[in-house]
Amino acid sequence: MTTPQPSQVRVAVTQAEPVWLDLKATVDKTCSLIAEAASKGAQLVSFPECWIPGYPAWIWTRPVDQELHSRYIQNSLTVSSPEMTQICKSANENNVIVVLGFSENIHNSLYISQAIISNTGSILTTRKKIKATHMERTIFGDAFADCLDSVVETAVGRVGALSCWEHIQPLLKYHTCAQREAIHVAAWPPLFEWGGPEDESLFSMSRDGTIALARTYAIESSSFVLHTTAVISQEGVEKMRTATGAIMNMPGGGSSAIFGPDGRLLSKPLLPTEEGIIYADLEMHDIYKTKAFVDVLGHYSRPDLLWLGVGSCDRRHVKEDAEERREDRVEVL
Protein backbone atom coordinates (compact mmCIF):
# COMPACT_ATOMS: atom_id res chain seq x y z
CA MET A 1 0.00 0.00 0.00
CA THR A 2 1.39 3.40 -0.99
CA THR A 3 1.82 5.96 1.79
CA PRO A 4 0.02 9.26 1.07
CA GLN A 5 2.55 11.90 0.02
CA PRO A 6 2.72 14.79 2.53
CA SER A 7 2.62 18.25 0.98
CA GLN A 8 5.80 19.39 2.75
CA VAL A 9 8.79 17.48 4.15
CA ARG A 10 11.60 18.98 6.22
CA VAL A 11 14.94 17.33 5.46
CA ALA A 12 18.37 17.57 7.07
CA VAL A 13 21.61 16.93 5.20
CA THR A 14 24.72 16.44 7.29
CA GLN A 15 28.12 17.90 6.49
CA ALA A 16 30.32 16.49 9.20
CA GLU A 17 33.55 14.71 9.97
CA PRO A 18 33.44 11.14 11.27
CA VAL A 19 35.60 10.03 14.15
CA TRP A 20 38.06 8.36 11.83
CA LEU A 21 38.51 4.59 12.25
CA ASP A 22 36.43 4.58 15.46
CA LEU A 23 33.17 2.66 15.13
CA LYS A 24 31.76 3.39 18.57
CA ALA A 25 32.59 7.10 18.56
CA THR A 26 31.20 7.62 15.06
CA VAL A 27 27.99 5.80 15.98
CA ASP A 28 27.66 8.07 19.01
CA LYS A 29 28.19 11.11 16.77
CA THR A 30 25.61 9.74 14.34
CA CYS A 31 23.01 9.57 17.09
CA SER A 32 23.88 13.10 18.23
CA LEU A 33 23.38 14.42 14.70
CA ILE A 34 20.06 12.56 14.41
CA ALA A 35 18.88 14.18 17.65
CA GLU A 36 20.08 17.61 16.51
CA ALA A 37 18.24 17.29 13.19
CA ALA A 38 15.07 16.19 14.97
CA SER A 39 15.26 19.17 17.32
CA LYS A 40 15.09 21.40 14.22
CA GLY A 41 11.99 19.63 12.97
CA ALA A 42 13.63 17.35 10.40
CA GLN A 43 11.67 14.31 9.26
CA LEU A 44 14.61 12.78 7.36
CA VAL A 45 18.37 13.06 7.85
CA SER A 46 21.08 11.87 5.44
CA PHE A 47 24.71 10.84 5.95
CA PRO A 48 27.68 10.60 3.50
CA GLU A 49 29.33 7.64 1.82
CA CYS A 50 31.20 5.43 4.31
CA TRP A 51 30.27 7.84 7.12
CA ILE A 52 30.99 4.96 9.50
CA PRO A 53 33.93 4.67 10.20
CA GLY A 54 34.97 7.36 7.67
CA TYR A 55 35.93 7.09 4.03
CA PRO A 56 39.30 5.26 3.59
CA ALA A 57 41.04 8.29 2.11
CA TRP A 58 44.52 6.71 2.14
CA ILE A 59 43.67 4.47 -0.83
CA TRP A 60 44.20 7.41 -3.21
CA THR A 61 47.69 8.00 -1.78
CA ARG A 62 48.96 4.40 -1.55
CA PRO A 63 47.24 1.14 -2.53
CA VAL A 64 48.43 -0.88 0.46
CA ASP A 65 48.40 0.12 4.12
CA GLN A 66 48.00 -3.02 6.18
CA GLU A 67 47.78 -1.18 9.49
CA LEU A 68 44.96 1.18 8.48
CA HIS A 69 43.20 -1.52 6.46
CA SER A 70 43.17 -3.82 9.48
CA ARG A 71 41.78 -1.08 11.70
CA TYR A 72 39.21 -0.25 9.05
CA ILE A 73 37.91 -3.83 8.97
CA GLN A 74 37.67 -3.92 12.76
CA ASN A 75 35.75 -0.62 12.89
CA SER A 76 33.36 -1.20 9.99
CA LEU A 77 29.68 -1.68 10.80
CA THR A 78 27.83 -5.00 10.80
CA VAL A 79 24.11 -4.73 10.11
CA SER A 80 23.18 -7.19 12.86
CA SER A 81 25.11 -5.48 15.64
CA PRO A 82 24.57 -3.46 18.82
CA GLU A 83 25.89 -0.39 16.98
CA MET A 84 23.24 -0.59 14.25
CA THR A 85 20.62 -1.24 16.92
CA GLN A 86 21.76 1.95 18.65
CA ILE A 87 21.26 3.95 15.45
CA CYS A 88 17.83 2.40 14.84
CA LYS A 89 16.83 3.22 18.41
CA SER A 90 17.89 6.83 17.87
CA ALA A 91 15.78 7.03 14.70
CA ASN A 92 12.78 5.72 16.63
CA GLU A 93 13.28 7.95 19.67
CA ASN A 94 13.62 11.04 17.48
CA ASN A 95 10.91 10.05 14.97
CA VAL A 96 13.30 10.61 12.04
CA ILE A 97 14.00 8.63 8.88
CA VAL A 98 17.75 7.99 8.57
CA VAL A 99 19.64 7.33 5.34
CA LEU A 100 23.03 6.06 6.46
CA GLY A 101 26.23 5.49 4.48
CA PHE A 102 28.66 3.01 6.01
CA SER A 103 31.41 0.50 5.39
CA GLU A 104 29.65 -2.82 5.91
CA ASN A 105 31.53 -5.74 7.45
CA ILE A 106 30.32 -9.18 6.37
CA HIS A 107 32.62 -11.83 7.82
CA ASN A 108 35.49 -9.31 7.50
CA SER A 109 34.88 -8.59 3.83
CA LEU A 110 33.90 -4.96 3.29
CA TYR A 111 31.27 -3.31 1.10
CA ILE A 112 30.23 0.31 0.53
CA SER A 113 26.69 0.21 1.88
CA GLN A 114 23.65 2.32 2.61
CA ALA A 115 20.71 1.69 4.92
CA ILE A 116 17.34 3.40 4.99
CA ILE A 117 15.90 3.30 8.50
CA SER A 118 12.29 4.23 9.21
CA ASN A 119 11.17 6.77 11.79
CA THR A 120 10.08 3.81 13.94
CA GLY A 121 13.57 2.32 13.88
CA SER A 122 13.03 -0.46 11.34
CA ILE A 123 15.63 -1.12 8.66
CA LEU A 124 13.64 -0.78 5.44
CA THR A 125 16.50 -1.73 3.13
CA THR A 126 20.25 -2.13 2.97
CA ARG A 127 22.12 -1.94 -0.31
CA LYS A 128 25.70 -2.12 -1.53
CA LYS A 129 27.46 0.04 -4.10
CA ILE A 130 27.17 -1.79 -7.41
CA LYS A 131 30.91 -1.47 -8.13
CA ALA A 132 33.64 0.05 -6.00
CA THR A 133 35.35 2.92 -7.82
CA HIS A 134 38.97 2.56 -8.97
CA MET A 135 41.20 2.46 -5.85
CA GLU A 136 38.21 1.56 -3.66
CA ARG A 137 38.58 -1.96 -5.06
CA THR A 138 41.68 -2.41 -2.88
CA ILE A 139 39.31 -2.32 0.12
CA PHE A 140 35.75 -3.11 -0.97
CA GLY A 141 34.00 -5.93 -2.79
CA ASP A 142 31.28 -5.73 -5.45
CA ALA A 143 27.60 -5.62 -4.62
CA PHE A 144 25.17 -8.46 -4.30
CA ALA A 145 21.73 -8.27 -5.93
CA ASP A 146 20.63 -6.05 -3.05
CA CYS A 147 22.40 -3.13 -4.76
CA LEU A 148 19.12 -2.70 -6.63
CA ASP A 149 17.05 -2.45 -3.44
CA SER A 150 17.52 1.30 -3.47
CA VAL A 151 14.03 2.80 -3.02
CA VAL A 152 11.52 2.21 -0.21
CA GLU A 153 8.18 3.51 0.99
CA THR A 154 8.48 5.74 4.07
CA ALA A 155 6.34 8.07 6.15
CA VAL A 156 7.37 10.96 3.86
CA GLY A 157 6.94 9.13 0.57
CA ARG A 158 9.31 7.06 -1.53
CA VAL A 159 12.96 7.56 -0.59
CA GLY A 160 15.94 6.23 -2.53
CA ALA A 161 19.72 6.29 -2.31
CA LEU A 162 22.83 5.79 -4.42
CA SER A 163 26.46 6.24 -3.55
CA CYS A 164 29.17 8.35 -5.21
CA TRP A 165 29.89 7.47 -8.84
CA GLU A 166 26.81 5.29 -9.06
CA HIS A 167 25.42 8.62 -10.27
CA ILE A 168 27.25 8.17 -13.58
CA GLN A 169 25.84 4.65 -14.16
CA PRO A 170 22.99 5.24 -16.67
CA LEU A 171 21.34 1.83 -16.26
CA LEU A 172 21.49 1.90 -12.47
CA LYS A 173 20.14 5.45 -12.40
CA TYR A 174 17.28 4.46 -14.70
CA HIS A 175 16.47 1.44 -12.54
CA THR A 176 16.41 3.66 -9.45
CA CYS A 177 14.21 6.25 -11.17
CA ALA A 178 11.88 3.43 -12.22
CA GLN A 179 11.15 2.80 -8.54
CA ARG A 180 9.49 6.24 -8.42
CA GLU A 181 11.43 7.92 -5.64
CA ALA A 182 10.37 11.38 -4.48
CA ILE A 183 13.48 12.06 -2.37
CA HIS A 184 16.92 10.81 -3.39
CA VAL A 185 20.02 10.73 -1.18
CA ALA A 186 23.31 11.05 -3.06
CA ALA A 187 26.10 10.01 -0.68
CA TRP A 188 29.69 11.17 -1.27
CA PRO A 189 33.02 11.35 0.59
CA PRO A 190 34.80 14.71 1.08
CA LEU A 191 34.91 16.57 -2.25
CA PHE A 192 37.30 19.32 -3.30
CA GLU A 193 37.43 22.14 -5.82
CA TRP A 194 38.88 21.26 -9.20
CA GLY A 195 42.27 22.86 -9.78
CA GLY A 196 41.67 23.95 -13.38
CA PRO A 197 43.15 22.80 -16.71
CA GLU A 198 46.51 21.97 -15.11
CA ASP A 199 44.85 19.69 -12.55
CA GLU A 200 45.48 16.05 -13.43
CA SER A 201 42.50 14.85 -11.39
CA LEU A 202 39.12 14.34 -13.04
CA PHE A 203 36.64 17.21 -12.97
CA SER A 204 33.90 14.61 -12.48
CA MET A 205 35.45 13.72 -9.10
CA SER A 206 35.53 17.34 -7.94
CA ARG A 207 33.09 19.38 -5.88
CA ASP A 208 31.60 21.11 -8.93
CA GLY A 209 31.59 17.96 -11.02
CA THR A 210 29.61 15.98 -8.46
CA ILE A 211 27.19 18.86 -7.89
CA ALA A 212 26.54 18.77 -11.64
CA LEU A 213 25.72 15.07 -11.29
CA ALA A 214 23.31 15.81 -8.43
CA ARG A 215 21.49 18.50 -10.39
CA THR A 216 21.30 16.24 -13.44
CA TYR A 217 19.86 13.41 -11.37
CA ALA A 218 17.23 15.73 -9.91
CA ILE A 219 16.19 16.87 -13.39
CA GLU A 220 16.19 13.38 -14.90
CA SER A 221 14.24 11.79 -12.05
CA SER A 222 12.02 14.74 -11.08
CA SER A 223 13.00 14.08 -7.47
CA PHE A 224 14.50 16.12 -4.66
CA VAL A 225 18.21 15.31 -4.30
CA LEU A 226 20.05 15.46 -0.97
CA HIS A 227 23.72 15.77 -1.97
CA THR A 228 25.48 14.61 1.20
CA THR A 229 29.23 15.01 1.77
CA ALA A 230 31.72 14.59 4.60
CA VAL A 231 34.44 16.88 5.94
CA ILE A 232 38.07 16.04 6.65
CA SER A 233 40.12 18.15 9.09
CA GLN A 234 43.88 18.45 9.42
CA GLU A 235 43.66 15.81 12.13
CA GLY A 236 41.85 13.56 9.68
CA VAL A 237 44.51 14.14 7.02
CA GLU A 238 47.15 13.13 9.55
CA LYS A 239 45.24 10.01 10.61
CA MET A 240 44.74 8.96 6.99
CA ARG A 241 48.34 9.99 6.12
CA THR A 242 47.19 11.66 2.91
CA ALA A 243 49.12 14.96 3.02
CA THR A 244 51.20 13.90 -0.01
CA GLY A 245 48.28 12.36 -1.89
CA ALA A 246 46.33 13.63 -4.89
CA ILE A 247 43.02 14.12 -3.05
CA MET A 248 41.82 14.57 0.53
CA ASN A 249 45.26 16.00 1.28
CA MET A 250 44.04 19.16 3.04
CA PRO A 251 41.19 20.20 5.33
CA GLY A 252 37.79 20.67 3.70
CA GLY A 253 35.64 18.55 1.43
CA GLY A 254 32.20 19.70 2.52
CA SER A 255 29.77 20.63 -0.25
CA SER A 256 26.42 19.30 0.96
CA ALA A 257 23.41 20.73 -0.86
CA ILE A 258 19.71 20.17 -1.54
CA PHE A 259 18.23 20.39 -5.04
CA GLY A 260 14.65 20.60 -6.27
CA PRO A 261 13.14 18.33 -8.93
CA ASP A 262 13.98 20.87 -11.65
CA GLY A 263 17.61 21.09 -10.48
CA ARG A 264 17.39 24.39 -8.61
CA LEU A 265 19.40 24.86 -5.41
CA LEU A 266 17.18 24.95 -2.30
CA SER A 267 19.81 25.26 0.44
CA LYS A 268 22.48 27.66 1.63
CA PRO A 269 26.01 26.16 1.64
CA LEU A 270 28.33 25.77 4.58
CA LEU A 271 32.04 26.47 4.22
CA PRO A 272 33.98 23.44 2.91
CA THR A 273 35.76 23.08 6.28
CA GLU A 274 32.61 23.67 8.34
CA GLU A 275 30.69 20.95 10.14
CA GLY A 276 26.95 21.34 10.43
CA ILE A 277 23.55 20.38 9.08
CA ILE A 278 21.70 22.08 6.24
CA TYR A 279 17.92 22.08 6.09
CA ALA A 280 15.17 22.62 3.56
CA ASP A 281 11.39 22.40 3.56
CA LEU A 282 10.54 20.44 0.44
CA GLU A 283 7.32 21.43 -1.32
CA MET A 284 6.45 17.98 -2.59
CA HIS A 285 3.85 19.29 -5.05
CA ASP A 286 6.76 20.77 -7.03
CA ILE A 287 7.27 17.25 -8.37
CA TYR A 288 3.97 17.55 -10.24
CA LYS A 289 5.16 20.74 -11.94
CA THR A 290 8.19 18.99 -13.40
CA LYS A 291 6.32 15.77 -14.20
CA ALA A 292 3.87 17.83 -16.25
CA PHE A 293 6.76 18.62 -18.62
CA VAL A 294 8.89 15.48 -18.43
CA ASP A 295 8.45 11.99 -16.99
CA VAL A 296 11.19 9.65 -18.21
CA LEU A 297 9.22 6.64 -16.91
CA GLY A 298 5.88 7.88 -18.24
CA HIS A 299 4.65 10.18 -20.98
CA TYR A 300 8.22 11.19 -21.98
CA SER A 301 9.44 7.66 -22.71
CA ARG A 302 9.25 4.99 -25.44
CA PRO A 303 9.47 1.57 -23.77
CA ASP A 304 8.36 0.02 -27.06
CA LEU A 305 11.75 1.09 -28.45
CA LEU A 306 14.07 1.22 -25.41
CA TRP A 307 13.80 -0.73 -22.17
CA LEU A 308 15.97 -2.02 -19.33
CA GLY A 309 16.59 -5.67 -18.49
CA VAL A 310 17.45 -6.58 -14.89
CA GLY A 311 19.06 -9.82 -13.70
CA SER A 312 17.22 -10.83 -10.54
CA CYS A 313 19.20 -13.78 -9.19
CA ASP A 314 21.62 -13.52 -6.27
CA ARG A 315 24.84 -15.47 -6.80
CA ARG A 316 25.63 -17.18 -3.52
CA HIS A 317 28.82 -19.13 -2.85
CA VAL A 318 26.96 -22.41 -2.25
CA LYS A 319 23.77 -23.16 -4.18
CA GLU A 320 22.04 -26.34 -5.38
CA ASP A 321 21.93 -26.81 -9.17
CA ALA A 322 18.13 -26.90 -9.28
CA GLU A 323 17.91 -23.73 -7.23
CA GLU A 324 20.43 -22.06 -9.56
CA ARG A 325 18.32 -22.87 -12.62
CA ARG A 326 15.11 -21.73 -10.93
CA GLU A 327 16.48 -18.35 -9.88
CA ASP A 328 18.50 -17.56 -13.01
CA ARG A 329 15.98 -15.36 -14.76
CA VAL A 330 15.75 -11.85 -16.15
CA GLU A 331 13.17 -9.24 -15.24
CA VAL A 332 12.35 -6.60 -17.85
CA LEU A 333 11.24 -3.13 -16.75
Curated annotation (Swiss-Prot):
Record domain CN hydrolase: where: 9-284
EC number of the protein: 3.5.5.1, 3.5.5.5
Source species, domain of life: Eukaryota
Primary enzyme class: hydrolase
Annotated InterPro entries: C-N_Hydrolase, C-N_Hydrolase_sf, Nitrilase/CN_hydratase_CS, Nitrilases_CHs
The reaction(s) this protein catalyses: a nitrile + 2 H2O = a carboxylate + NH4(+); 4-chlorophenylacetonitrile + 2 H2O = 4-chlorophenylacetate + NH4(+)
GO molecular function: arylacetonitrilase activity; hydro-lyase activity
Catalytic residues identified in the record: E49, K129, C164
Keywords: Hydrolase
Phosphoprotein keyword on record: no
Membership in a protein family: Belongs to the carbon-nitrogen hydrolase superfamily. Nitrilase family.
Protein task: Nitrilase that hydrolyzes preferentially phenylacetonitrile, (R,S)-mandelonitrile, and 3-indolylacetonitrile.
Protein name: Arylacetonitrilase
